[in-house]
UniProtKB/Swiss-Prot annotation:
CDD domains: GlmM. InterPro entries: A-D-PHexomutase_a/b/a-I, A-D-PHexomutase_a/b/a-I/II/III, A-D-PHexomutase_a/b/a-II, A-D-PHexomutase_a/b/a-III, A-D-PHexomutase_C, A-D-PHexomutase_C_sf, A-D-PHexomutase_CS, Alpha-D-phosphohexomutase_SF. PROSITE patterns: PGM_PMM. Activated by phosphorylation. GO terms for biological process: carbohydrate metabolic process; peptidoglycan biosynthetic process; UDP-N-acetylglucosamine biosynthetic process. The keyword Phosphoprotein applies. Binds 1 Mg(2+) ion per subunit. This is Phosphoglucosamine mutase. Its EC number is 5.4.2.10. Catalyzes the conversion of glucosamine-6-phosphate to glucosamine-1-phosphate.
Length: 446
């Protein structure tokens, strides 16, 4: 049974769940496990722009150095940049301090192995066992303590990496781009990358103050971006979240393009260029049935996984896919990155737009999404999904939807809520079955 790790690292309210004491123990435990070989061991640590990042960063430094690991501090950097730099800087482990799209009050700790991939379940459980144990006999002698220093040049390294994911002959000349960095980790690197590639760049969400990350900006609050794109007659809008591992696109008409539509557009282009390593892509159970029907219609297949980009990536690695992602905008292009990278995904889409010489609206809306309704039911304790009344309601709902729709019920991996999602050709029917299941779950959770 997991105590600390969820579907995307450790996450919770800063100084309540994510305390200095916990961060210290995470640093010590991870440091012990990843000290392999006789070389001088090092860890890279990045963070987003939350006020609590300073506190957690300092505690992690104390933890890693106390077990003899050197620490390289990157400062505010996107999660995918930390993964890339873990490999590039030959680190034994990478750490990202972020709660992604959550408000500033929350924070989290994500860990990457030396290959830049998120840790598997076994390693996370091994770290958990050490966190809850006595670490005193694992501490280094005074002469063997680690050192810590800040690295100043990392922004340029990530910008060059992102630019190199485009063919040399492809530029963004002639594109007016509005980019929303969510007052988060990409506030510096995303606008600079787009500008260096030739775009006319208008930036919003680039004034972090420790409190305003994801506040009315970013991929989970794209209304400001939509308004700016229309107002400035931009060609495209790009919204990143707080740690820039997810992206939402806005076309020139102000219409939103989610992860499903983005994957469809890229999959079609990569299929034509024979760039797909498998004849299909990987998505989660939350991706729209319209995506699956479209992918099948062009001769490709859609593999589904549990929710979470780690499970998408796991399936991609096991079965040889190089394209996958989530409706929420976590897009993984494994030719370039070991995790979701919002900026790289946006660049790959813009490459398709430039190649086709068409407006974003004509490239991105490959299919008509089926009506999809998602509702959350908050609960305090227990397992309401095991209640007989809920089991009966779920079975009845699935019978009503039949072959023309889908029903997905799952507990969130990051907060105490149960998500109820249904989709199908008949919007009224979808709404009815969602309400029925939500009512049953709500009563069981009371």
């Amino acid at each position: 049974m997991r105590k600390h790790f969820g579907t995307d690292g450790i996450r919770g309210r800063a100084n309540v769940v994510i305390t200095p004491e916990l961060a210290l123990k995470v640093g010590q435990a991870a440091g012990v496990i990843f000290q392999r070989g006789d070389h001088r061991h090092r860890v890279v640590i990045g963070k987003d722009t939350r006020l609590s990042g300073y506190m957690i960063e300092t505690a992690l430094v104390a933890g890693f150095t106390s077990v003899g690991m050197d620490v390289l501090l990157l400062g505010p950097m996107p999660t995918p940049a930390v993964a890339m730099l873990t490999r590039s800087m030959r680190a034994d482990i990478g750490v990202m301090i972020s709660a992604s799209h959550n408000p500033y009050e929350d924070n989290g700790i994500k860990l990457f192995g030396p290959d830049g991939f998120k840790l598997n379940d076994d390693l996370e459980l091994e770290i958990e066992s050490l966190i809850d144990g006595d670490m005193r006999n694992r501490l280094s002698a005074s002469r063997d303590l680690g050192r810590a220093k800040r690295i100043e040049s990392v922004h340029a390294r990530y910008i060059e990496f992102a630019k190199r994911t485009l063919p040399r002959h492809v530029t963004l000349d002639g594109l007016r781009v509005v980019v929303d960095c969510a007052n988060g980790a990409a506030y510096r690197v995303a606008p600079e990358t787009l500008w260096e590639l030739g775009a006319e760049v208008i930036s919003i969400g680039v004034e972090p103050d420790g409190f305003n990350i994801n506040h009315d900006v970013g991929s989970t609050a794209p209304e400001t971006l939509v308004q700016k794109v229309r107002e400035l007659r931009a060609d495209v809008g790009i919204a990143l979240d707080g740690d820039a591992d997810r992206v939402l696109i806005v076309d020139e008409k102000g219409q939103k393009v989610d992860g499903d539509q983005l994957m469809a557009a890229v999959a079609r282009s990569w299929q034509e260029d024979e760039r797909l390593t498998q004849p299909g892509l990987v998505a989660t159970i939350m991706s729209n049935l319209g995506l699956e029907r479209y992918i099948n219609s062009i001769g490709l297949t859609l593999a589904r996984t549990a929710v979470g980009d780690r499970y998408v990536l796991e399936h991609m690695r096991q079965h040889g896919y190089n394209l996958g992602g989530e409706q929420s905008g976590h897009i993984i292009m494994s030719d370039y990155a070991t995790t979701g990278d919002g900026l790289v995904a946006a660049l790959q889409l813009l490459s398709v737009v430039k190649r086709r010489n068409l407006p974003v609206s004509e490239v991105c809306h490959c299919f008509e999404p089926l009506p999809q309704i998602l509702k959350n039911v908050r609960f305090r304790s227990g397992e309401p999904l095991r209640a007989d009344s809920v089991v009966t309601a779920i079975a009845h709902a699935k019978d009503r939807l039949g072959q023309s729709g889908r029903l997905v019920i799952r507990p969130s991996g990051t907060e105490p809520v149960i998500r109820v999602m249904a989709e199908g050709d008949d919007r009224d029917l979808v709404a009815e079955v969602v309400d029925e299941v939500v009512d049953a779950v709500t009563r069981a959770a009371a």
